[in-house]
Regions:
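Glycine-rich, often acidic, oxyanion-interacting loops/wings at catalytic, nucleic-acid
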Residues: 137-232
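Short alpha-helix plus adjacent loop in nuclease-associated cores
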Residues: 78, 84-122, 130, 134, ...
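Short glycine-rich phosphate-binding loop at a beta-alpha junction
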Residues: 58-69
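Short glycine-rich, Thr/Ser-proximal phosphate-binding strand/loop in the N-terminal lobe
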Residues: 19-43
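Phosphate-backbone recognition surface of nucleic-acid-processing proteins
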Residues: 234-235, 241-325, 353
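Gly/Thr-rich phosphate-binding beta-strand-loop-beta motif of the actin/hexokinase/Hsp70
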Residues: 2-27, 109, 142
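Short, basic/hydrophobic alpha-helical segments
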Residues: 43-60
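Basic, amphipathic alpha-helical segments enriched in Lys/Arg and hydrophobic/aromatic residues
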Residues: 320-358
Length: 358
């Protein structure tokens, strides 16, 4: 009897968290065999895998949040040669019926992996695209911090004493920043209001310049990765390094998980959504998908609308047919997504050919 249980195929599900993961296992009849908590360490991953395989041959595992709390577990399971699926959020009706707990979420993940619903192929996150994503995230926060520093500089100048404001009039942005950074206020005179403004403005200017240099260094690294991964993409009209890097991140290290160009368009939020009923036959704007990728496609479309004659003719023809200019641009974004998908799938270099060094 024990041998039969061991040989039976089972499916696992994991609800991921920061400190503890909750695992569940279902049998061939989708019946829950057990649930258990495990730590989010390599030892915890080993214990989880051993516990799951104790019920039988592990067919596949459904994991929630493979890009955040479940990223470490995903890498461990993939390195072990297991079939891993990413499980999306539970159905709202099911949530209302059963309630919410970590154990219930783990069981729902196992049920989803068993039936193949609410599951997608996860990004592998072990290639150069993951490096690109980390650099882009760092750059985004640096740009945000630089913008905040500049805003505070302008705010302080507005409320500064007149003698300081007169010195800073009619300057460009970088002239202003470098002037403030070259000031040498007396740090011991922090009780004097005018001198405190000098100290504050100098500190903010130095912060701005440091972030400016940091962003420039990150841009060099991002451009090098994009040139190596997708040289043909960056050669296309109006596709810069920012847009190209975002589209690469959206596709992921394993773009083969995108089975068709329409799937990539839906992922980017540029595929029309049917809203037909009865005699009404129409489509509406897709407000879903990766909005960062949608923004990248929009930037490319606007750039081509300014520089490419064929794009201008296409938009003019669409407008003449009765569409608005915005609707024509949405159609254009759909065509651009098809072009990008083809380039990503047909590129000579495999995106994940150079793994991250452990």
């Amino acid at each position: 009897m024990v041998d039969k249980v061991t040989e039976a195929a089972v499916v696992g599900g994991v609800d991921t968290h920061k400190v503890l993961h909750v695992a569940a296992v279902v049998d061939q009849n989708n019946k829950v065999l057990g649930t258990q908590f495990f730590s989010t360490t390599r030892q915890g991953y080993r214990q989880m895998l051993a516990w799951m395989t104790s019920f039988g041959a592990l067919k596949r595992i459904g994991v929630e949040c493979t890009g955040t709390y479940g990223s470490g577990l995903l890498r461990y399971l993939q390195n072990a040669g297991l079939d891993v699926l990413e499980v999306t959020a539970p159905d709202r009706m099911e949530r209302r019926k059963r309630g919410k707990s970590d154990t219930i979420d783990a069981e729902c993940a196992a049920h989803a992996a068993f039936s193949g619903i609410r599951t997608v192929t996860p990004k592998t996150r072990n290639g150069m695209i993951e490096s690109l994503r980390v650099l882009k995230t760092c750059r985004k926060t640096a740009i945000s911090a630089r913008r905040v520093a500049l805003q505070i500089i302008h705010s302080n100048i507005i409320s500064a004493p007149d003698e300081l404001r007169e010195q800073l009039r009619n300057m460009t942005r970088m002239q202003l920043i470098r002037t403030l950074g070259s000031w040498r206020p007396d740090a011991s005179e922090y009780r004097n209001v005018t001198n405190v403004y000098r100290i504050s403005l100098k500190s903010l200017a130095r912060r701005y310049l440091e972030l400016h240099d940091e962003i420039a260094d990150l841009d060099v690294m991002i451009a090098a990765i994009v040139d190596e991964l997708a040289p043909e993409l960056i050669k296309r009209n109006a596709i810069g390094y920012e847009s190209a890097s975002q589209l690469l991140i959206t596709a992921g290290d394993n773009p083969q998980r995108l089975r068709s160009e329409s799937g990539f368009a839906a992922l980017c939020g540029v595929s029309p959504v049917p809203v037909s009923s009865g005699k009404t036959n129409r489509y509406r704007l897709n407000r879903g998908g990766d909005r960062a990728a949608n923004s990248a496609l929009h930037i490319i479309a606007i750039g081509r609308l300014r520089t490419d004659d064929k794009t201008k003719e296409y938009v003019a023809r669409r407008v003449a047919e009765g569409h608005t200019k915005m609707e024509a641009i949405r159609c254009l974004k759909r065509y651009i997504s098809r072009e990008v998908y083809t380039l990503l799938r047909n590129q000579n270099r495999q995106i994940n050919s150079i793994p991250i060094t452990a």
